[in-house]
A protein has these predicted regions:
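Conserved active-site segment immediately N-terminal to the catalytic lysine
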Residues: 155-188, 217-222
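Short beta-strand-to-turn element immediately C-terminal to the catalytic PLP-Schiff-base lysine
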Residues: 179-180, 194-199, 239
Length: 374
């Protein structure tokens, strides 16, 4: 079996460091908002070249509290994509706002900035571009529309830690960048975790208060907040991992290019596209293929841990029925959900494993075509 991700292999390379860091936290007696969280926030600010970061309980909370900090709520609209994980729109719903969907670019899987202006109404307050699979969005075009219409921008970077657009870190273009440290992420903890980044001190202070029950001073509460604090153990683990992230991302890129080489003569496999002047960090290596569901089943039977991210676009999910956005309204998103499949991708993946994955995928596609022709 070749899994989609193998966390155990990564742990084997840094396990002693992680265990030492965790034991130091346990011995310290400081488990919430202690020195590791503070140090990690500063290290992430340095890594991103932004003024502030705030550690949180999850990427979902990062999106939620970013919206709260910008006073977005009931009656407001937020433009985003339907081809993403539900947390993006979940956060919009939690604050009482309405998600408005625009379609994606067929090749990059990201928000198509040329379709933004048609979605703007007097109620539009923000845009949430999602840097899906580690691929940066076209931030120049998105920021130009946002500036023209005086809209906030919250970047969903949960799959794109370390990705670059024209040499600048994604997550530092808008009002906020939001990260997830879910264990499967490029920079993953060993539990839940998240973070916002911003260079606006007032926005930072608002999130600091919101994450801790709505108050900056203990037992003094200025508004309804939440309990969304990155705990010390996760912060300590992430501090061990952060110095490795550039090398891990480079390994992912190397694997992606090798996959591209292995698939170059197979017309049935459309490999990922990269925008010019971007640095994709390949959280997923996602291709488009014919007979996707049949091929996926065959791959699983043959021990290849391929996954479908995502099989149903958000506008067609039950949770968003109330929006009245029917089938056919986002044709590219809908088409891609029927064709995309993500192949094993993690830094420790070997070339031998990649060759096995590639040959198996090509064989499964050929077999599925033969079945369809009968």
């Amino acid at each position: 079996m070749i899994p989609i991700l193998d966390s155990k292999r990564q742990y084997a390379t840094i396990g002693s460091e992680v265990e030492k860091a965790v034991c130091e936290v346990l011995r310290s007696g400081s488990y919430i908002l202690g020195p590791n969280t503070k140090a990690f926030e500063q290290e992430m600010a340095d890594f991103y070249g932004c003024k502030y970061t705030v550690g949180l309980n999850s990427g979902t909370d990062a999106l939620h509290l970013a919206l709260r900090a910008l006073n977005i709520g009931a009656g407001d609209e937020v433009i985003t994509v339907a081809f993403t994980f539900v947390a993006t729109t979940e956060a919009i719903g939690i604050v009482g706002a309405k998600p408005v969907f625009v379609d994606i670019d067929e090749n990059t899987f990201n928000l198509d900035a040329s379709k933004l202006e048609a979605a703007i109404t007097p109620r539009t307050k923000a845009i949430i571009p999602v840097h899906l699979y580690g691929q940066p969005c076209d931030m120049d075009a998105i920021m130009a529309v946002a500036k023209k219409h005086n809209l906030h921008v919250i970047e969903d970077c949960c799959q794109a830690v370390g990705a670059l657009y024209k040499g600048k870190m994604v997550g530092t273009f808008g009002d906020f960048g939001c990260l997830s440290f879910y264990p499967t992420k490029n920079l993953g903890g060993m539990g839940d975790g998240g973070l916002i980044m911003t260079s606006d001190e007032k926005l930072r202070d608002r999130v600091v208060a919101l994450r801790n029950h709505g108050g900056a001073v203990r037992y003094h509460h200025d508004e309804i907040g939440v309990n969304s604090r990155l705990d010390e153990i996760q912060a300590a683990i992430l501090r061990v991992k952060l110095p490795h992230i550039k090398d891990w991302n480079e390994a992912r890129r190397k694997h992606a290019y090798y996959y591209n080489e292995l698939f170059k003569d197979c017309a049935d496999i459309q490999t990922p596209a990269e925008l010019d002047d971007t640095y994709c960090v390949y959280h997923q290596y996602t291709v488009k293929i014919p007979n996707r569901d049949e091929v996926h089943k065959m791959l699983q039977e043959r021990g290849i841990g391929a996954m479908l991210y995502y099989p149903i676009p958000l506008h067609l999910q039950k949770v968003h029925e109330y929006l009245g956005v029917g089938k056919g309204s986002l044709p590219i998103s809908e088409k891609n959900t029927e064709m995309v499949i993500s192949l094993p991708m993690f830094p420790e993946l070997t070339e031998e494993e990649q060759r096995t994955i590639a040959s198996t995928l090509i064989d499964c596609i050929e077999k599925s075509k033969s079945k369809a022709a009968v």
